[in-house]
Swiss-Prot record:
Its job: As accessory component of the DNA polymerase epsilon (DNA polymerase II) participates in chromosomal DNA replication.
Record has DNA-binding as a keyword: yes
Protein source organism: Candida glabrata (strain ATCC 2001 / BCRC 20586 / JCM 3761 / NBRC 0622 / NRRL Y-65 / CBS 138)
Region described as Disordered: 107-147
Gene Ontology MF, one: single-stranded DNA binding
Broad class of the protein's primary localization: nucleus
One of the protein's GO biological processes: DNA-templated DNA replication maintenance of fidelity
InterPro entries xrefs: DNA_pol_a/d/e_bsu (IPR007185), POLE2 (IPR016266)
Further comment: In eukaryotes there are five DNA polymerases: alpha, beta, gamma, delta, and epsilon which are responsible for different reactions of DNA synthesis.
UniProt gene name: DPB2
Protein's name according to its UniProt entry: DNA polymerase epsilon subunit B
Keywords: DNA replication, DNA-binding, Nucleus
Pfam family for this entry, one: DNA_pol_E_B
Family to which this protein belongs: Belongs to the DNA polymerase epsilon subunit B family.
Length: 719
């Protein structure tokens, strides 16, 4: 389109282009053209299509392609100059990639093919491409004589019996290049699942920034080499850490049906109850609720009015709870707050707070509080234009981000159906290699798995029972030397299982006791993300295992059409330690407990049994482990972040916060939480798995996971 030949550039006045642009962009595609956008289009069309731009059919074709890409990227209704430049750059990148692929295909040398004409004579393709010697060949002539200047008498002569053969070869050479495009050749290619299977550490994950004004995601190229080596984030990364997470959550919330009603029927005293009912009933109630969010800066001077605020819950320097959004912060009063159950309210969580604003003291009295409702993965991908955020289907550039083609997604789903035999094995956490009890359990498990080697085996740390630091152990050797010897022992054990080391991809994810974060934290929760185990300890393992990845924490696996997140963290322990206790809830719990004790003290044994049965029948008494696991999963996925805490609780590397974001939520989240029991839950289409601890008494536990069916089976091996 952009290389149609030599043209004479011209300067087109925007009013001259307006009728054509109106017919194509406005009437056909429903776009509204701004004056600066029309000027940018005029400059490009004048320099590309020249003086004959009105009569050139490529001009109309360009405008149609431009409008199609604009609609695909969901850039909005108004065509401005910035968007015009971005779309034109993307079109150029696409054409450049297509031309490069065509040139690569054209540069493939033709293969020599042998033909038999049926009469016993064998003829090769080289015979038709080589001119037969003739008496005139000995005559001297100019060396630069072209093939068009050769007389017919000097041209290559072909026998009559070889004419059908020559026609066949000519058709085979010319037809594919003429009739089949590179896209069609890609569609006809058989997909190899290994091309769409990749383990992505945090250092390899692509970084994207979010523009809240345009509501678009942009690719951020890596930093220069000096800053990458120093690994020093700048101050801008600190401010973007909160803003990006807040705006992503806000835009996700505004896409919810409860916030898209045009009816101005906002009733703050019942909005939280209505929102909760809509979430529980999957938005089956069509009654408009008219929910709207108010920025904190707009509360000034509006004393005694009801509002709904979206902000980060944290404690201010005065020791009071406050809410903070992009416009400011305000102190809150939670003495009469009724929170939605089934969630962990922790410092750093983004919450929806409903209440009354008082000018005196600039305080917001919260009456109810909940989390922003979650969103399914497919809906989020549709909103962002099916961007390939993992970089599996193409290479990112500053002006171009590859997308997930719908046809490729369907083909990958079909390929998953043919790979139902593939499975992932998730060994429980705390694989202490310095514990002989653990090593015996590993040997038993590997013996069983070697009979039918899985596709992936994931080993979760910590791999040492004590933090690895610069100190001498009880054996008068350094802890680092002992740590290395433990991995050498593991490598020696794996060498006995040929199927595993040859056909299985081994993934090792560090824990809080593993270097080098253990030098600073001494076993406590360190900063995230955590880098992989250093290569100094992995040399022997790399020699034994053909496919091994020393992963970071967290890490991501791209498996065909799915995204799997692996994360090792004691999340439940942190939530229990730092959750906010609301006075109304605690007082109600204390009253119920006191009333129950009083009734049991005043009743006989028979009456007590009846009383307990009545209490159990009135309340849905689920096991505490089930309730805790549900709260953990809902808290993580609704927050859209693996560490929704403030920096004082869980530090985060400022420039690596994008590796902890769950936007969109993954297909599967594997959370190795040693402070919680093993579980597997599905919430908003995301399968969440916790393998639990590896050793339980004399049992070695692990989980088999089939990605296609998302089926989980817990296995136990006694030893």
């Amino acid at each position: 389109m952009f290389t149609s030949g030599k043209v004479l550039p011209t300067k087109i006045q925007p009013p001259l282009l307006r009728p054509m642009a109106y017919r194509v962009l406005s009437k056909k595609y429903g776009l509204s053209i701004k004056s600066d956008g029309l000027a940018a289009l005029s400059d490009f069309i004048g320099s590309t299509f020249g003086m004959d731009w009105k009569r050139n059919p490529d001009t109309i074709k360009f405008l149609e392609v431009f409008a199609t890409v604009w609609k695909q990227q969901e850039r909005g209704l108004f065509v401005d100059s910035t968007g015009v430049k971005d779309v034109i750059n993307e079109l150029k990148e696409r054409e450049k990639a297509t031309l490069q692929e065509s040139q690569n295909m054209a540069s493939i040398p033709p293969k020599t093919k042998t033909y038999n004409n049926g009469g016993g004579k064998t003829t090769t393709i080289d015979r038709f491409l080589t001119k037969r010697p003739s008496p005139s060949d000995n005559d001297e002539g100019p060396l630069d004589q072209s093939i068009d200047d050769i007389p017919v008498s000097q041209a290559t002569q072909i026998d009559e019996e070889e004419l059908p053969m020559a026609q066949e070869i000519s058709d085979q050479i010319s037809s594919p290049a003429r009739d089949q495009t590179p896209e069609e050749e890609f569609d006809n290619r058989i997909l190899n699942w290994r091309d769409y299977f990749r383990i992505i550490n945090t250092t390899d994950q692509k970084k994207f920034s979010y523009n809240p004004v345009k509501r678009q995601i942009f690719y951020q190229p890596p930093k220069d080499q000096l800053k990458s080596v120093l690994k020093i984030p700048n101050a801008q990364a600190k401010t973007d850490l909160f803003r990006t997470r807040y705006f992503l959550t806000r835009d996700r919330l505004l896409r919810n049906e409860s916030f898209q009603s045009s009816h101005d029927t906002f009733n703050p005293l019942s909005s939280m109850i209505q929102l909760k009912n809509n979430i529980n009933n999957n938005n089956q109630d069509d009654t408009p609720t008219g929910l709207s969010i108010t920025q904190i800066k707009n509360l000034l001077g509006r004393d005694g009015q009801n509002f709904l605020i979206l902000g980060v819950l944290k404690m201010n320097p005065k020791g009071q709870w406050s809410l903070e959004d992009a416009s400011g912060s305000i102190d809150i009063d939670i003495s009469q707050t009724l929170p939605s159950p089934g969630l962990f309210y922790i410092p750093g969580a983004i919450v929806l707070a409903e209440g009354i604003y008082y000018t005196v003291g600039h305080t917001f009295a919260v009456t109810s509080m909940t989390f922003p409702p979650g969103e399914r993965r497919d809906k989020t991908l549709d909103h962002i234009g099916n961007l390939d955020l993992l970089g599996i289907h193409g290479t990112e550039k500053s002006s171009y981000i590859p997308r997930l083609d719908n046809e490729i997604k369907i083909r990958l789903h079909l390929l998953e159906q043919d790979l139902t035999h593939q499975k992932f094995v998730l060994l429980g956490g705390d694989l202490f290699l310095d514990d002989q009890h653990v090593m015996d359990g590993l040997k038993k498990v590997f013996t069983k798995l070697d009979q039918e080697a899985p596709t992936v085996i994931v080993l979760f740390g910590s791999f040492s029972s004590f933090p690895v630091h610069a100190a001498m152990s009880s054996k008068n050797i350094s802890s680092t030397t002992e740590y290395k010897n433990n991995f050498d022992s593991l490598a020696e054990m794996l060498s006995q299982f040929e199927n595993i080391i040859n056909h299985t991809h081994v993934v090792l994810i560090p824990g809080p006791h593993d270097p080098w974060v253990s030098l600073c934290s001494l076993g406590a929760n360190g900063s995230l993300p955590q880098s992989s185990i250093p290569t100094h300890f992995s040399k022997r393992m790399n020699k034994i295992c053909k496919n091994i990845t020393w992963a970071s924490n967290p890490t991501r696996i791209a498996y065909l059409s799915q995204e799997i997140v692996l994360f090792r963290d004691n999340f439940l322990e942190l939530c229990k330690r730092h959750q906010i206790l609301f006075p109304v809830v605690e007082s109600k719990r204390a009253e119920d407990l006191a009333e129950l004790e009083e009734q049991m003290a005043n009743n006989s044994i028979d009456d007590t049994t009846i009383l307990v049965d009545r209490i159990i029948s009135e309340k849905q008494q689920l096991p505490a482990k089930v309730l805790e696991s549900r709260k953990v999963v809902k808290t993580l996925l609704d927050q859209g972040h693996l560490s929704p805490f403030v920096d004082s609780i869980r530090p985060i590397s400022w420039d690596m916060d994008h590796t902890l974001t769950l936007y969109p939520i993954p297909s599967t989240l594997i959370l190795a939480d040693m402070s919680s029991a093993a579980y597997d839950l599905t919430y908003n289409g995301c399968k969440t798995i916790n393998p639990g601890k590896f050793i339980h008494k004399r049992q070695a536990r692990y989980i088999q996971f089939q990605p296609y069916l998302k089926s989980v089976s817990q296995e136990e091996v006694f030893f």
